[in-house]
A protein has these predicted regions:
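Membrane-interfacial amphipathic/re-entrant helices at transmembrane-helix boundaries
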Residues: 1-55, 90-113
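Cytosolic-side transmembrane-helix boundaries in multi-pass membrane proteins
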Residues: 1-26, 221-228, 251, 301-336
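Short loop segments and helix-boundary regions at transmembrane helix junctions
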Residues: 2-7, 62-67, 86, 106, ...
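Transmembrane helix-bundle core of multi-pass membrane transporters
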Residues: 4, 99-105, 112, 136, ...
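Single transmembrane alpha-helix segments in multi-pass membrane proteins
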Residues: 23-25, 38-90, 131-138, 276-286, ...
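Membrane-embedded helix boundary and interhelical linker motif in transport proteins
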Residues: 63-128
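Helix-loop-helix "hairpin" substructures at the membrane interface of multi-pass membrane proteins
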Residues: 110-117, 125-128, 181-256
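Transmembrane alpha-helical segments in multi-pass inner-membrane proteins
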Residues: 241, 252, 256-317
C-alpha cells in the first residue's frame, strides 16, 4: 500500500486524531484543566456504553443497506417504562391516567422486570419495521420513520408529555456499581461487543447477513432466506435497543420522558458510517462501530469541556459525517 492509498483509506481518522491532539493542547490554555485524564477517559467510556448497544443494532441494518430512524424514540420509550417500573414510590406521572407503584416488588426484581418489558417493547416495534422491509420491500427509511412517529406520539399521548420520577438509586448500585473509580457499565458494553462480534463473524446468520447485504438476489439464489435474515437483523437490533435504553436509565438515575433520546438515531447512524459500515451493504466491522461511537462521544465530551456551544458541536459532527460518507461513496465508485 503506497502513501496515497494509505491516506485515502485512513485520512479521516488521521484528521480526527489531529483534532483531538489540538483539543488536548487548547483545553489547558483556555479552561486551565487537562483533557486527557483518567477521569475524563472513564467518563467518555461510561457515556459511550449505552450508545454502543444502539450503534451495534443500527449497524446490522446498515449492513442490509437499511437504517433506523426510530432509535432515539426507542430510548425515550425505554426511559419512560424504566422510570415507571423502577421508581421508588408512587410515580409523578401516569399512563392513560393510571398511576403505577411497583415498590411492593423487590428492587432487583423490578430492575429485571423493566429490562424484560423494555426489550419486549423495543423488539416488538423493531420487528414491525423489519416486517415491512422483509415482506413488502418497503425501504426501512420509511418504516422506521413511521415507527419513530408512532412511538413518540403514543408515549407522549399516553403520558401527556409528563416526565416521570427518578429510578430507585439502589438499582444502579446493584447492576452497574463502581469498583473504585471504574464504572462497571463499561463491562456491559464489552460483553455486547463480544456477543455481536461472535454473531456477525462466527455464526451462519452473520455470514448470511453479509451475503444478503452485499447482494440479496445472489443470496436468495444460493438458498439463503432474505426474509429470515432481514427479520433477524431487526430483532437483534430491537434487543440491543432495549438493553441500551435500560442501561442509559441506570446510568442517568434521572427522570424519563418521551422526548429523551431525541437525536440519538443520528448519533448511532453517524457512528456506524464513520466506523466504516457502508450504506452500499455487506461491508462493516464491529471494531469500526465501536470506534465510531467513541469518536463522537469523545468529541462531544471534549467540546463541552472546552465550552463550545452545542449548535457548533452539531456543525463539527456534520462535517465529519459528510467526509465519512463522501469517502465511502468514492470507494464504492472506484470499486464499480
Amino acid at each position: 500500500m503506497n502513501s496515497s492509498q494509505f491516506l485515502y483509506k485512513n485520512g479521516l481518522y488521521i484528521v480526527i486524531i489531529m483534532i483531538f491532539i489540538a483539543l488536548c493542547i487548547i483545553t489547558p490554555m483556555v479552561k486551565n484543566t487537562q483533557l486527557l485524564t483518567m477521569s475524563n477517559i472513564l467518563n467518555i467510556l461510561k457515556q459511550a456504553s449505552p450508545r454502543i448497544f444502539l450503534a451495534l443494532g443500527v449497524a446490522g441494518l446498515i449492513l442490509l443497506t437499511g437504517t433506523d430512524l426510530s432509535v432515539g424514540r426507542m430510548v425515550g420509550l425505554g426511559m419512560v417504562t424504566a422510570t415507571i417500573i423502577m421508581h421508588n414510590g408512587v410515580n409523578t406521572g401516569g399512563v392513560f391516567g393510571h398511576i403505577f407503584d411497583f415498590t411492593g416488588i423487590p428492587a432487583p426484581a423490578r430492575a429485571l422486570l423493566e429490562l424484560v418489558v423494555c426489550v419486549i417493547l423495543t423488539t416488538g416495534f423493531a420487528s414491525i419495521a423489519g416486517l415491512f422491509m422483509a415482506r413488502f420491500k418497503m425501504h426501512p427509511f420509511i418504516s422506521t420513520m413511521a415507527n419513530m412517529l408512532i412511538i413518540f406520539g403514543l408515549v407522549t399521548y399516553a403520558t401527556k408529555g409528563v416526565s416521570f420520577g427518578a429510578i430507585d438509586s439502589a438499582i444502579p448500585a446493584m447492576f452497574i456499581p463502581r469498583i473504585g473509580k471504574f464504572p462497571t457499565i463499561i463491562l456491559w458494553a464489552v460483553v455486547a461487543v463480544i456477543v455481536v462480534w461472535f454473531i456477525w463473524n462466527k455464526t451462519t446468520f452473520g455470514k448470511n447477513l453479509y451475503a444478503v447485504g452485499g447482494n440479496p438476489e445472489a443470496a436468495a439464489v444460493s438458498g439463503i432466506s432474505v426474509f429470515a435474515v432481514t427479520m433477524g437483523a431487526f430483532i437483534l437490533a430491537g434487543i440491543l435497543y432495549g438493553f441500551g435504553s435500560w442501561l442509559e436509565c441506570n446510568r442517568m438515575i434521572g427522570s424519563g420522558s418521551a422526548a429523551y433520546g431525541q437525536g440519538w438515531d443520528m448519533d448511532a447512524i453517524a457512528a456506524c458510517v464513520v466506523g466504516g459500515v457502508s450504506f452500499t451493504g455487506g461491508i462493516g466491522k464491529i471494531s469500526g462501530v465501536v470506534t465510531g461511537v467513541l469518536i463522537f462521544t469523545a468529541l462531544t465530551y471534549s467540546l463541552t469541556i472546552l465550552g463550545i456551544d452545542t449548535n457548533l458541536q452539531f456543525i463539527f459532527e456534520g462535517i465529519i459525517i459528510l467526509a465519512a460518507v463522501t469517502l465511502d461513496c468514492l470507494k464504492y465508485v472506484k470499486k464499480k
